[in-house]
């Protein structure tokens, strides 16, 4: 299982400056077959400076959620660090 990309990412308007909400389509390689899932995710910056990433799956997934969520959080953190998220 590997996250290939998150396509069609759109940032939603939120009046809270330390919270960013996004929607998109996660493309994940499950058993050597790319599969698309619609997701909503948020990145919240805590007062300590730590990032908290939350993910909501809009489509149902026929795969254990814990490893998928862990991989997606790592991928989102990586693209956020590289400045790859839309403004």
Regions found by a protein language model. Name each.
Residues 1-10:
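A short, amphipathic edge element
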Residues 10-19, 30-32:
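Short, solvent-exposed beta-strand/turn "edge" segments of beta-rich domains on protein surfaces
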């Amino acid at each position: 299982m590997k996250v290939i990309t998150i396509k069609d990412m759109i940032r939603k308007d939120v009046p809270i400056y330390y919270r960013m909400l996004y929607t998109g389509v996660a493309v994940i390689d499950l058993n050597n077959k790319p599969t698309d899932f619609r997701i909503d995710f948020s990145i919240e910056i805590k007062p300590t400076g730590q990032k908290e990433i939350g993910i909501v799956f809009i489509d149902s997934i026929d795969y254990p959620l814990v490893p998928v969520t862990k991989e997606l959080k790592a991928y989102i953190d990586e693209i956020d660090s590289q400045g790859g998220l839309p403004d």
